[in-house]
Amino acid sequence: MALVKEVLEVLNRLSPFELQESWDNSGLNVGSGNSEFSQIIACLEITLQIALNAQENALIITHHPLIFKPLKTLNDEAYPGNILKILIQKNISVISMHTNFDKTHLNKHFARALLRFDGLIEKGLMLVKENANIEFDVLLEKIKLSLGVGQLACVKSSQMIKDLAFVCGSGASMFSSLKAQSCLITGDVKYHDAMIAQSLGISLIDATHYYSERGFALIVAEILHSFNYLVTIENFKNPLQII
């Protein structure tokens, strides 16, 4: 069997962990680089069910770090201790590819492959399309069609949108670097973000955290397949539902 550190080295070459934000926790979160693994699983998030279904000695590659904030206690009756207990008992290793992967792969997938926009400029965690000159209503319908959803929360501050900005995941706080008549497409838009953006003449479209990043597992699987690794993709439904 192959070693965890061999996969870690491949991932680091393609999406260097040093690119992650200072507050992030990408890299080997659980296990040892010298461990052998029985299978590779790629997922957006490690859920309790994914941990239960995984083989012993598996390697799970996830987008969101299971261990994100420093742990003061490890309570197996609370999150994330309930999942960590299973992983440790089954000798499962976990690699997280978070903000480093946003910069190198996932944001491009969100804006280009999923939403089908081109001519994009990289600005930190954002991808920007200048002089898009598109009507807000047309833009909103295009995004809903691309995501396959009927409704999206949004802030319509102007009918004509000059510049577009894309941030997969939770990027609503980044609108402060934009100008009036811009539109930021991201996830996790909060009430106060919406109020401030509206006052500045900036539009927002909440494509949701889930939909903007759900391509993660497939991208990782395709990358590792090119290095002759077999990867099982574990998908799950968005836990937030509109009823």
UniProtKB/Swiss-Prot annotation:
One GO cellular component term: cytoplasm
Binding-site residues, a divalent metal cation 2: H64, H209, E213
Record field: catalytic activity: GTP + H2O = 7,8-dihydroneopterin 3'-triphosphate + formate + H(+)
Binding site for a divalent metal cation 1: H63, D102, E213
GO molecular function: GTP binding; GTP cyclohydrolase I activity; metal ion binding
EC numbers on record: 3.5.4.16
Record key words, sorted: GTP-binding, Hydrolase, Metal-binding, Nucleotide-binding
Pathway(s) served: Cofactor biosynthesis; 7,8-dihydroneopterin triphosphate biosynthesis; 7,8-dihydroneopterin triphosphate from GTP: step 1/1
Family affiliation: Belongs to the GTP cyclohydrolase I type 2/NIF3 family.
Known function: Converts GTP to dihydroneopterin triphosphate.
Protein name: GTP cyclohydrolase 1 type 2
Organism: Helicobacter pylori (strain J99 / ATCC 700824)
Lineage of producing organism: Bacteria, Pseudomonadati, Campylobacterota, Epsilonproteobacteria, Campylobacterales
